[in-house]
């Protein structure tokens, strides 16, 4: 059975995890973003957030079609998060820019399945895709 959380608790958890990711070096400045499923919508970190300026009131509720209200804009990567929620049963998405992953991506090729844990990514390898401008549909 899936445990249900209220909106305030989800916002607080997203904020705490965003700060944690930065504190352990998985994100720097405003790179990376986190979200969670919230009913038929998602809650996502705001555009321009950093570990030092994010708070639970800044987390943005967004429909999976990209509609939101309020003064804050969602992360520019909301489309990627929405696509994952539309296609899977995922309950949360964590997108980081860790130094090691960036270094691997700069090689321009996927990560081969050299260890059984690669299978946790859903295949026999971790694929690579060419760079595209962040926040676009591409």
Predicted regions and their residues:
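Glycine-rich flexible loops
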Residues: 1-138
